[in-house]
């Protein structure tokens, strides 16, 4: 169970970093 929690936290932090970088730059992919 601990491994599942650690993987969830890792994916969560990576997701937050990805979205912060994505929203910081202009959304060129959407347009």
Curated annotation (Swiss-Prot):
Entry's localization field: Plastid, Chloroplast thylakoid membrane
Signal peptide bounds: none
PANTHER family: PHOTOSYSTEM II REACTION CENTER PROTEIN T, PTHR36411
Keyword Manganese in record: no
Membrane topology: Single-pass membrane protein
The protein's name in its UniProt record: Photosystem II reaction center protein T
Domain of life: Eukaryota
Gene Ontology BP terms: photosynthesis
Oligomer and partners: PSII is composed of 1 copy each of membrane proteins PsbA, PsbB, PsbC, PsbD, PsbE, PsbF, PsbH, PsbI, PsbJ, PsbK, PsbL, PsbM, PsbT, PsbY, PsbZ, Psb30/Ycf12, at least 3 peripheral proteins of the oxygen-evolving complex and a large number of cofactors. It forms dimeric complexes.
GO cellular component: chloroplast thylakoid membrane; photosystem II reaction center
Keywords: Chloroplast, Membrane, Photosynthesis, Photosystem II, Plastid, Thylakoid, Transmembrane, Transmembrane helix
Keyword Plastid included in the entry's annotation: yes
Its job: Found at the monomer-monomer interface of the photosystem II (PS II) dimer, plays a role in assembly and dimerization of PSII. PSII is a light-driven water plastoquinone oxidoreductase, using light energy to abstract electrons from H(2)O, generating a proton gradient subsequently used for ATP formation.
Family that this chain belongs to: Belongs to the PsbT family.
InterPro entries, per the entry: PSII_PsbT, PSII_PsbT_sf
Main location: plastid
Transmembrane segments: 3-23
